[in-house]
Amino acid sequence: MAADDYVVADMSLAAWGRKEIEIAETEMPGLMACREEFGEAKPLKGARITGSLHMTIQTAVLIETLKSLGAEVRWASCNIFSTQDHAAAAIAETGTPVFAVKGETLEEYWTYTDRIFQWPDGQPSNMILDDGGDATMYILLGARAEAGEDVLSNPDGEEEEILFQQIKKRMAETPGFFTRQRAAIRGVTEETTTGVNRLYQLQKKGLLPFPAINVNDSVTKSKFDNKYGCKESLVDGIRRATDVMMAGKVAIVCGYGDVGKGSAQSLAGAGARVKVTEADPICALQAAMDGFEVVTLDEAIATADIIITATGNKDVVSLDHMRKMKDMVILGNIGHFDNEIQVAALRNFKWVNIKPQVDLIEFPDGKRIILLSEGRLLNLGNATGHPSFVMSASFTNQVLAQIELWTRGSQYENKVYVLPKHLDEKVARLHLAKLGANLTKLSPEQAAYIGVTPEGPFKPDHYRY
C-alpha cells in the first residue's frame, strides 16, 4: 500500500484496534469458520472488492476474512459518524487501503467513496460490497451522466449537491471512468434494507447492470442483526449520548419492521412505555398484539420523551411534528439515512453541541430538542453498533454471497437474488455451538414424513420465520 493510500484519524490507535479485533474474533464464529473452510482454496483470488460499510471492529474482522480468502480490498465507511477510528487504524496498518474517519464532512465522505474505486494500477474494481447502496449508486449515476443523461442538474438537498460535484470532478479528471467501472463489476452484495430497496427499484426499471445478492433478506441477517442487534445497540446509544433514565418514560418508535421491532423491545426492556407508529396494517397488528399502543405521530407526539425513527422512509418526523414535541425530548434515528427526520429544517435554529454527535437545538419559543447523530444512525454514531456475535451472522452471509457471485456470477442474470436456504441454515448452524445449543436430529422416517432430508433445508423458501 502506498504511503498516502489511506485516510484514518490517528494511526497510533492501531494497537488498541488490534486488541479489540482479536476479542471480536472470538465472538464471530461464522467468519472464523469461513477462514478455516475456504482459506486454503482462496475462492476470492482475483476479486478486487470495493467495500462501503461501517468501519467498525466487526467490519475489520470481515475485511480480514475477505483478504484471507484471496481478495484485494479497498474500504470506506457508509456513514459519516459510524467509523471506529481505532478499527480503521488497525486495518490501515495491515496494508489495506481504508478511508474512514468518525465525523467526516459530506465532502470527505464522497471523496472517500470515490477513492475506494481508485486502484494503484488504474484498473477497476470487479466486486462491490455495499451497505445502503451509495457505492453502487455512485458508479451507476456517474455512468448515466457519461452517457449523456441529465441526472446531475437538480440535486435534492445538500448531500446530493456534494455527490453530483464529486461525480462531475471524476468525469473531468478521468473521462469514461464510470462506464468502464460499471462494465467491470461482476456483482454487488447489499447489506441493508435501504440499499436492497434501491436495487429492486433498479431491477424494476431495467437499470440493474449486474447481478446482486440481497444479503439483508437472508433470515440469519434480517431476523437477527436487524432485530436482536437493534435490541441491544439502540438503548446503548441513547444511554451513552444522554445518560437519561428510560424507565417510566414515554417512547415512540416510528416503524415496526424488523428494526422497529428490535427497537421497541429495546426501549421496553429499559422500562419505557412504548408506542408505535406504522403505515402497514400487518406490522401495526403485530405491534398491537406484542402489547404496544399503535398511534399516529400527530396524536401522540406531545406525550413522548424519546422518539426514534426506524422506517426507511423520508420526512417521517417533520418540522411541524418537532414544534409539537416536549421540551428536552430526545430525538434519534436508527434507519440507514438521515432523511427520516427533517434535520435540514432545523439548521436556522440555535444549535449547541453538547458532545460529539449530541446537539441541543433551541426553537424560537425557547423549547429545546436533544438530537442524536444529526439524525443519522444513532446506534453507530453515539455507540459502537451491534455486538460482534450478531454481526458474525450478517457478515458470514456477505462472505458467502461474495464467493457465490465471484465464482458463479456468469450463471446469474442482472437481477436481485437471495442466498439459497441451505446457506442460510449453514450460517445459523455455525453460530449454535458458541451459545451451547444442540440440534435435534431427525430420523430418516421423520424427515421423509415432512418432506425434507435429515440434513435440511428444513423449511420451504416461502416459510416466514
UniProtKB/Swiss-Prot annotation:
Q: EC number(s) in its UniProt entry?
A: 3.13.2.1
Query: Known catalysed reaction(s)?
Result: S-adenosyl-L-homocysteine + H2O = L-homocysteine + adenosine
Binding of substrate occurs at: 56, 131, 191, 221, 225
Pathway connected to this protein: Amino-acid biosynthesis; L-homocysteine biosynthesis; L-homocysteine from S-adenosyl-L-homocysteine: step 1/1
InterPro entries linked: Adenosylhomocyst_ase-like_sf, Adenosylhomocysteinase-like, Ado_hCys_hydrolase_NAD-bd, NAD(P)-bd_dom_sf, S-Ado-L-homoCys_hydrolase_CS
Q: Name one GO biological process term.
A: S-adenosylmethionine cycle
State the source organism's domain of life.
Answer: Bacteria
What does the record's cofactor remark say about binding?
Binds 1 NAD(+) per subunit.
A GO term for molecular function: adenosylhomocysteinase activity
Q: Which keywords does this Swiss-Prot/TrEMBL entry list?
A: Cytoplasm, Hydrolase, NAD, One-carbon metabolism
Which positions in this protein are listed as binding NAD(+)? 192-194, 226, 255-260, 278, 313, 334-336, 379
CC cofactor? NAD(+)
Main subcellular localisation: cytoplasm
* GO cellular component terms, semicolon-separated: cytosol
Q: Where in the cell is it found?
A: Cytoplasm
Function comment: May play a key role in the regulation of the intracellular concentration of adenosylhomocysteine.
Q: Which family does it belong to?
A: Belongs to the adenosylhomocysteinase family.
Any idea what this protein is called?
Answer: Adenosylhomocysteinase
Organism equals Chelativorans sp. (strain BNC1)
